[in-house]
Amino acid sequence: MEISRLSDRYTVLRMTEDHIAEVYALCRNNALYYHYCPPFVTEDSIASDMKALPPDKEYSDKYYLGYYEGEKLIAVMDLILRFPDKDTAFIGFFMTDISVQNAGIGSGIIGSLCAYLKDLGFSSIRLGWVKGNPQSEHFWKKNLFLETGVTYDTDGYTVVVANRKI
């Protein structure tokens, strides 16, 4: 995957440990997300997320991405290709900076992602949102993700699994 093709509007970088402070600065201002999906973010939790993989996946399929407008980090995405099957990409995490929310920027990023993944031969994108989080549910449904009917429980919350055909 050529990450530069994920957006024609923003600079997209593969995030590393050098970017943890920037990612933390973006995430810590999104208190509503962590109200529904505890615990609250820390630099250590970001470092852990940057390395987290589902069973039987390789790091070559994981892209922890930052979207920049100029020098400003405006969005973060954890994307895993070919999961849970070879035709599906999985968004493990997506968050925009609070200063750019409700302006169509997140939806634009997701639209560009869907178009590029379709060009690469993927047929769907899967993700989950925390049940009861109205902001997340509204955003993903607005972006054509449909509930699969599958949910699973974690410590403290339930995840609603959703899918979008591309």
Residue ranges and their predicted role:
Residues 97-103, 131-132:
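Active-site acidic-Proline motif in GNAT/NAT acetyltransferases
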Residues 117-129:
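Conserved GNAT acetyl-CoA-binding A-motif
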Residues 107, 131-149:
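Conserved active-site alpha-helix within GNAT-family acetyltransferase domains
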Residues 5-10, 14-20, 25-99, 110-112, ...:
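Acetyl-CoA-dependent GNAT
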